[in-house]
Amino acid sequence: YGSTMRAVLEKVRPNSMSQMNAVQLYRPSVAQRQKEMLNLSLQKLEEASLSAQSSTKEEASLRMQEAQLISRFVAKARTVVPKGEVILNESNIDSVLLEDGDVINIPEKTSLVMVHGEVLFPNAVSWQKGMTTEDYIEKCGGLTQKSGNARIIVIRQNGAAVNAEDVDSLKPGDEIMVLPKYESK
């Protein structure tokens, strides 16, 4: 407690399978704040669905059904327990002060890239230098019909999430997440 991340990592004796450039930090105080922000967002979503105006009887009926669906979603979402992950930047790891209760995880090296979301067969694919995001998606059967012009995100092993369009090259341990396209009324 009060020590820096760098000081702690210097005391660690990694083995050959330790992925030291993807260190993960989980912090209870961050998890608590994430939960507060999630609850606030859910409250606003619920309020917006319940206060939506309708001009016809049919529209009012649709809005009521929509509000019920949103209320069920909100009830489920309230049970989510945030991890409290802090995404670390290698360049300023010296300035990260540790707090009581922090958990440091050093992931194992892997030779896989996970692909999930709106793909036909979500799967793990062996990493190959030069393969693109699209190549990995094709190895999983391609996009589903629901994907439309879906947003694709790459989640790095250290927890950082990056728009796939901004990724020059994929690394072992990356995850490709194809988010579904949401159709609004």
Model-derived features: where do they sit?
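Ser/Thr/Pro/Gly-biased, low-complexity, turn-/loop-rich segments
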Residues: Y1-K185
